[in-house]
């Protein structure tokens, strides 16, 4: 018996409850590849599925990279460092496969079938996110390519969001949150990151009284994350200005901080209501 679209969505929900996210991905990928535009619920299920699958690997990569840094500073640990690097490479292969998978679905099916401004922003934001994840661990030409692709997708999403979504819309706020993380972590541009986050926060504050009751919780949650990142980043900028003589040491500390305590970002695409 062939599996219907409704069956795939139901099985994806079942897989989510069972925390079997790889199967959730497969079911939602089947829905996404149908050529029909996804509903808001289907869109969120797809986002949750891929974010759980890749989120576990991103967390693993940060932990292993942190251990690698510590071992590199020790004497007589060359063999252990080689083992760690091989293990990190295995995780990076998995990260690449997952990212390439969803990026292919986005380019082949989801973006071409999107008809509303909301869905276009959602998918271009996703495209920016997954290229950013590739840039997190890549180097050389691969990092440059992933960085440029992420920037282009985020810019496209921002242009559409500015004209078609209000400043308080959860998807527009989530885009600003993740785009600012891109500037801070990938492009090492704290000034751009702070400017973008502050602008999004201020624009939303100015129209807070227009928020509907159903969107209020989602929007204010993301606004809090924007403010949390601004607090973290502005303190980093202040410290760097006061400690120019210890610049090299501070850069190492910042790298460790990024691996162990990353800035807040929107991890589930559009919050479910």
Curated annotation (Swiss-Prot):
Which keywords appear in this protein's UniProt record, sorted alphabetically?
Acetylation, Cytoplasm, Nucleus
List, as start-end ranges, the regions of compositional bias called Low complexity. 245-261
Q: Which InterPro entries match?
A: 14-3-3 (IPR000308), 14-3-3_CS (IPR023409), 14-3-3_dom_sf (IPR036815), 14-3-3_domain (IPR023410)
Keyword check for Iron-sulfur: no
* Molecular function as annotated in GO: DNA replication origin binding; phosphoserine residue binding
Region annotation (Disordered) maps to 236-273
Q: What is its main location?
A: cytoplasm
Record SMART domains = 14_3_3
Gene3D superfamilies (alphabetical): 14-3-3 domain
Q: Where in the cell is it found?
A: Cytoplasm; Nucleus
Q: Which Pfam families does the record match to this protein? A: 14-3-3 (PF00244)
The reply on keyword Signal is no
From start to end residue, where is composition biased (Polar residues)?
Answer: 262-273
Give residues where N-acetylserine occurs. Answer: 2
Top-rank taxon, per record: Eukaryota
Q: According to its UniProt record, which protein family does this protein belong to?
A: Belongs to the 14-3-3 family.
Which proteins does it associate with, and in what oligomeric form?
Interacts with NTH1 (via N-terminus when phosphorylated by PKA); the interaction is direct and activates NTH1. Interacts with FIN1.
What is the recorded name of this protein? Protein BMH2
Native organism is Saccharomyces cerevisiae (strain ATCC 204508 / S288c) (Baker's yeast)
């Amino acid at each position: 018996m062939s599996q219907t679209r409704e069956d795939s969505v139901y099985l994806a929900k079942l897989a989510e409850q069972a925390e079997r996210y790889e199967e959730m991905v497969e079911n939602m990928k089947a829905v996404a590849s149908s050529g029909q535009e996804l509903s808001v619920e289907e869109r969120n299920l797809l986002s949750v599925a891929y974010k759980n699958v890749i989120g576990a690997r991103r967390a693993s990569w940060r932990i292993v990279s942190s251990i690698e840094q510590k071992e590199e500073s020790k004497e007589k640990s060359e063999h252990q460092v080689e083992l760690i690097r091989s293990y990190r490479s295995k995780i990076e292969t998995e990260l690449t496969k997952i990212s390439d998978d969803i990026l292919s679905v986005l380019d082949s099916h989801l973006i071409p079938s999107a008809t509303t401004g909301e869905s276009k922003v959602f998918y271009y934001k996703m495209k920016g996110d997954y290229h950013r994840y590739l840039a997190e661990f890549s180097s050389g030409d691969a990092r440059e390519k992933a960085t440029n692709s992420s920037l282009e997708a985020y810019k496209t999403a921002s242009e559409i969001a500015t004209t078609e979504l209000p400043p308080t819309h959860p998807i527009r706020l989530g885009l600003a949150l993740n785009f600012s993380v891109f500037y801070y972590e990938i492009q090492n541009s704290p000034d751009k990151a702070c400017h973008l986050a502050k602008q999004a926060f201020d624009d939303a504050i100015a129209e807070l009284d227009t928020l509907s009751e159903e969107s209020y919780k989602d929007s204010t949650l993301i606004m809090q994350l924007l403010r949390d990142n601004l607090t973290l980043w502005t303190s980093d900028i202040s410290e760097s200005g006061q400690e120019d003589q210890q610049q090299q040491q501070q850069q190492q500390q910042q790298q460790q901080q990024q691996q162990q305590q990353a800035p807040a970002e929107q991890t589930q695409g559009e919050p479910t209501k």
